[in-house]
Amino acid sequence: MAVKLKIKKGDSVKVITGDDKGKTGKVLAVYPKTLKVVVEGCKIAKKAIKPSEKNPNGGFINKEMPMDISNVAKVQE
């Protein structure tokens, strides 16, 4: 049975637990099957990029990673 999620893409949320506790941001993506959300500017991870035609040297990028939906609360706008 599917769970009805109260948080949608584009909502403003506040992180209530974890390393980014207290930060607010916009929801960039919602994953209902795994009950995870991606919040702008929170849970940043450094990802390695292989060399390609666009980026011949490769390198690293900072990317927002999904966090559990129970770790965020919707904020009134």
From Swiss-Prot:
Keywords: Ribonucleoprotein, Ribosomal protein, RNA-binding, rRNA-binding. It holds the Pfam family KOW. InterPro entries: KOW (IPR005824), Rib_uL2_dom2 (IPR014722), Ribosomal_uL24 (IPR003256), Ribosomal_uL24_CS (IPR005825), Ribosomal_uL24_KOW (IPR041988), Translation_prot_SH3-like_sf (IPR008991). It comes from the Bacteria. One of its GO terms (cellular component) is ribonucleoprotein complex. One of its GO terms (biological process) is translation. One of its GO terms (molecular function) is rRNA binding. The keyword Acetylation does not apply. One of two assembly initiator proteins, it binds directly to the 5'-end of the 23S rRNA, where it nucleates assembly of the 50S subunit. One of the proteins that surrounds the polypeptide exit tunnel on the outside of the subunit. Part of the 50S ribosomal subunit. Belongs to the universal ribosomal protein uL24 family. This is Large ribosomal subunit protein uL24. The gene is rplX.
